[in-house]
Amino acid sequence: MAWVPAESAVEELMPRLLPVEPCDLTEGFDPSVPPRTPQEYLRRVQIEAAQCPDVVVAQIDPKKLKRKQSVNVSLSGCHPAPEGYSPTLQWQQQQVIQFSSVRQSVHKHRNHWKSQQLDSNVTMPKSEDEEGWKKFCLGERLCAEGATGPSTDESPGIDYVQVGFPPLLSIVSRMNQATITSVLEYLSNWFGERDFTPELGRWFYALLACLEKPLLPEAHSLIRQLARRCSEVRLLVGSKDDERVPALNLLICLVSRYFDQRDLADEPS
């Protein structure tokens, strides 16, 4: 086998787009000054290319990398419903029809509700504020660790800061698709480690109603994650008459049958 110079081997992997023949230059050629002729310019390019290393290694500062990194593995399929827990096909079809009507109404009246003045106590968090959105949707009382006792606030009316703001149309109409996806992720993360609550259910329904189709990949992954988590929690519910069962069934139904994730659908009872 003939010996191939290292430079030739590199050129085989990175061929020249414009082959350049050796240039006849004057003895006074100085590569440190601007080129005066096309030949001097091409020769200068050759010299600079020869000085480039064959392999370049990026210097990465580990401190600048995100400390908290996660990988979401998408597993297919929901846990089958326990016997007697699965809704009928007719019930599922009715929910899809009603949900479609809600989505159309939200879309039609979005500009109207977006223009409505929010109450003075409503301050919507920024899109990237995960903790802020959890408190906004679920309330500071539920988000506070160990805070299970009744509120000591004796003022009349409902303290939404403590119990969470409901997904009013005047609120969700102000949320763009990026914010809707972010809040869906924040609440899904919360739900992944905790039980189902009515507050979660209301917000999940409202966010799904505002989620535009076709789904972006991130939203697609999130709603599948939501349906699977609902099926996991349903397995732990002790009675089919528990009020959580129809709410969990509804979310699984909407994800699977409205958003066309049919592999997650419940088999009709």
Curated annotation (Swiss-Prot):
Region forming the signal peptide: none
Keyword Cytoplasm: yes
GO CC annotation: cytoplasm; cytosol; Gemini of Cajal bodies; nucleolus; nucleus; SMN complex; SMN-Sm protein complex; spliceosomal complex
Keyword Nucleus: yes
GO BP: spliceosomal complex assembly; spliceosomal snRNP assembly
Pfam families: SIP1
Transmembrane annotation, as ranges: none
Subcellular location: Nucleus, Gem; Cytoplasm
InterPro entries per the UniProt record, alphabetical: GEMIN2, Gemin2/Brr1
Similarity comment: Belongs to the gemin-2 family.
Function recorded in the entry: The SMN complex catalyzes the assembly of small nuclear ribonucleoproteins (snRNPs), the building blocks of the spliceosome, and thereby plays an important role in the splicing of cellular pre-mRNAs. Most spliceosomal snRNPs contain a common set of Sm proteins SNRPB, SNRPD1, SNRPD2, SNRPD3, SNRPE, SNRPF and SNRPG that assemble in a heptameric protein ring on the Sm site of the small nuclear RNA to form the core snRNP (Sm core).
Subunit and partners: Monomer. Part of the core SMN complex that contains SMN1, GEMIN2/SIP1, DDX20/GEMIN3, GEMIN4, GEMIN5, GEMIN6, GEMIN7, GEMIN8 and STRAP/UNRIP. Part of the SMN-Sm complex that contains SMN1, GEMIN2/SIP1, DDX20/GEMIN3, GEMIN4, GEMIN5, GEMIN6, GEMIN7, GEMIN8, STRAP/UNRIP and the Sm proteins SNRPB, SNRPD1, SNRPD2, SNRPD3, SNRPE, SNRPF and SNRPG. Interacts with GEMIN5; the interaction is direct. Interacts (via C-terminus) with SMN1; the interaction is direct. Interacts with SNRPD1; the interaction is direct. Interacts with SNRPD2; the interaction is direct.
Protein name: Gem-associated protein 2
